[in-house]
Design a protein with these regions (language model features):
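Acidic/His-enriched low-complexity segments
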Residues: 1-225, 250, 255, 343, ...
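Hydrophobic alpha-helical and helix-loop surface patches within well-folded domains
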Residues: 152, 181-384, 388
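Ala/Thr-enriched low-complexity intrinsically disordered regions
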Residues: 391-392
């Protein structure tokens, strides 16, 4: 990804294997200017593909594994959709859930398509000294007088909605966590200048979350680095991108002298929620967006249990039920009522609701009651040796 002052050029190399040889290849793409398409080093002419209505269609592709190289230009500085890659507050950042990655590159933008990713980001060192993406940083290099590049490698297959990029001028707070097996993980909080003194509670909350997931679910963090970016201009509350969580500052920053207990607990809970997604959502993700609550309802249940274990189980349960009655019950009784597993939708972004999250968490809690804690835990600890089977 080559970041310039007025545009970004994204060159991708996809290794593809046809499941049904003879069928056309269809990829998603929105607001992209295609500069070139190449299959197995052979450039395609405009007559060999069509690009319309958010779909790239290549009718004739090899029947065996092949490599597709695409080169597209996009303008994140004029992107007002708040999806894909966009500029806000002097930073470039991404929001790819649910269908935002198609605004970055041509891709099979579905949650059941899992891929290994390696990303190289190049930008101006003066305007973008920090370049972040998923996984571990494996190479840093100087490119010309005022340009640099960082290459990130994520060894675990993930869908495109978990891709993340942040580029800009941020301050770093660094710490470390030693997992139960003895691996050392580097923890980094990236904040805007002047926010450094207000990060201690968030860092401590992250460490507590990691330790709780190990002790309760026997789930260790699986990479060498974990990054959280907290910026005021992020349009969502928080996003669980693999190893690069992006937060609105209000859910990370806290002054211990002035923050209320409720604010501190909220920060701790949301940081835990996004961290718990590392397994319940990222490593094991949903087959399609109709299954959204299988990651969100489950992870809400997990963060509820985390807060209950660290503080008061009774108080936490009362708070959760009060919230359910005041918000989700009203949704269920109104014109926007919908099931936890919807049968259809016009736009998936409309389904990030209290029904999917909080009512979904209650269904997970009910399953634990019906199965009993031991059988429930055995079911939840399922992981498949095949990444393709991890979309369930």
């Amino acid at each position: 990804m080559n970041i310039q002052d007025d545009h970004v050029v994204v060159a991708s190399m996809l290794s593809l294997e046809p499941r049904r040889p003879g069928e056309p290849l269809v990829l998603c793409g929105v607001d992209l200017a295609i500069e070139s398409l190449v299959i197995d080093q052979a450039p395609l002419s405009p007559e060999e593909y069509s690009f319309a209505d958010g779909r790239l269609t290549i009718p004739n592709v090899p029947g065996q594994p092949f490599v597709l190289e695409t080169r597209c230009r996009l303008d994140p500085y004029s992107n007002s959709s708040l999806e894909g890659l966009y500029a806000s507050g002097g930073l470039l950042s991404t929001q790819c859930e649910a269908e935002g990655f198609r605004r970055i590159s041509l891709h099979p933008d579905r949650p059941d398509v899992l891929s290994r990713w390696q990303v190289r980001i190049e930008a101006s060192r003066s305007s973008c000294p920090v370049l972040l993406s998923n996984g571990n940083a494996v190479q840093e290099e100087s490119v010309g007088a005022d340009r640099h590049a960082v290459t990130w490698d994520d060894p675990f297959p993930k869908p495109s909605y978990l891709f993340a990029l942040v580029a800009g001028d941020l301050r770093e707070i660094r710490d470390h966590y030693t997992t139960a097996s003895g691996r050392q993980v580097t923890l980094r909080l990236h904040v805007e200048e002047g926010d450094e003194p207000f990060t201690a509670h968030a860092m401590a909350s992250l460490k507590r979350s990691m330790q709780w997931d190990e002790s309760v679910y026997n789930l260790e963090y699986d990479l060498d680095e974990y990054n959280i970016v907290a910026v005021r201009h992020f349009n969502m509350g928080a996003m669980e991108n693999k190893s690069l969580n992006i937060f609105n500052s209000k859910l990370v920053l806290a002054d211990a002298e002035t923050a209320t207990d409720a604010e501190l607990e909220r920060i701790e809970s949301v940081i835990a929620h996004e961290y718990f997604h590392n397994w319940s959502g990222n490593r094991i993700t949903c087959r399609d967006w109709f299954q959204l609550s299988l990651k969100e309802g489950l992870t809400v249940f997990r963060d509820q249990c985390f807060t209950a274990d660290l503080h008061s189980e009774a108080v936490k349960r009362i708070e959760d039920v009060a919230m359910l009655r005041n918000t989700q019950f009203r949704e269920d009784a109104g014109p926007t009522a919908h099931p936890v597993k919807p049968a259809e939708y016009q736009a998936i972004d409309n389904f990030y609701t209290t029904t999917i999250y909080e009512k979904g968490a209650e269904l997970i809690r009910m399953l634990r009651t019906l199965l009993g804690p031991e059988r429930f835990m055995n079911c939840l600890l399922y992981t498949s040796p095949s990444p393709r089977d991890n979309t369930t």
